[in-house]
Amino acid sequence: MNDVKKDPVELVLCDMDGTLLLPDHTLSPRTFEAVKSLQDAGIHFTLASGRPPKAMREIIKQLDIQLPFAGFNGGLLVNAQGEYLQSHHVHPEAVRKTLDLLAGHKVEVWLFVEDDWLLRDPHGEMVEHEQQGLGYAPQVVESFEPYLHQVHKIVATCNDAPLLMSLEQRLQPLLKGLAVASRSQARYLDITALEANKGNALVTLAEYLDVPLARTVAIGDGGNDPAMFRRAGFSVAMGQAPEEVRAQAQVVTGSNIEDGVAQAIDRFIL
């Protein structure tokens, strides 16, 4: 193990998109083998993502992960049998405030209610890309009104990254004490429950597995990942992560197209 990391590692919590996965949402052979090496060494490995659990299950299956995993940035904690261990909905007032603000901007707005992906415009330019990533189709609804009390995540998305950054900065004070707004990727602004962040997910998973936080590692690339960086014993940012994300990790590995997760496992964990 590299001398940067002092405590033996018992649990690795890893982001998916932009971290574990290649840009085409697949696992590289090198990363697959590195995760298997971790598991063979008796080190727990599981995932935390902004995705709904349904969109995580194929990778969970490929890696034979038998541990609970966190969807919606920790909004849903799910065990290997698909049972919910924790479920956090976005406060209805936060949902309404968010929808009201976003209505005045050229962004696509999606709601996630458990595994259902709800939208009003099936022809939005981001829909096809999202469907490829999630692996299933959206449900078209006339109105979001019936779902205000059931929301696990709101997504605002478009190709205008500066607009999403501006909306994030406006939503954070607006939703203070009600919900969390963070960009999981440059083109995705997520609004999740106040309790739903990857840091809380890491703490819950560590307690579930009886692992001290000092013996945990968090790996990620997005604006929703520093929450787990701050709680983990050791934190790793991907090479292509935004500068403000890299600055909050203890070390930086290669990018996801360079098998950065495998590099981190080989260099800092095994």
Language model: regions and residue ranges:
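Mg2+-dependent phosphoryl-transfer enzymes with acidic/Ser/Thr/Gly-rich catalytic loops
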Residues: 2-11, 28, 190-270
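Asp-based phosphoryl-transfer active-site loop
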Residues: 8-23
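Active-site phosphate-binding/coordination module
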Residues: 24-127
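Hydrophobic packing residues within well-ordered alpha-helices of enzyme cores
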Residues: 31, 56-60, 167, 171, ...
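Residue-level signal for inorganic ion chemistry
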Residues: 38, 49, 73, 154, ...
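Short active-site oxyanion
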Residues: 42-46, 65-67, 153, 214-215, ...
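Short, structured coil segments at secondary-structure junctions
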Residues: 63-65, 72-73, 175-177, 231-232, ...
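Conserved acidic, metal-coordinating active-site core of Asp-based
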Residues: 105-219, 223, 227-231, 240
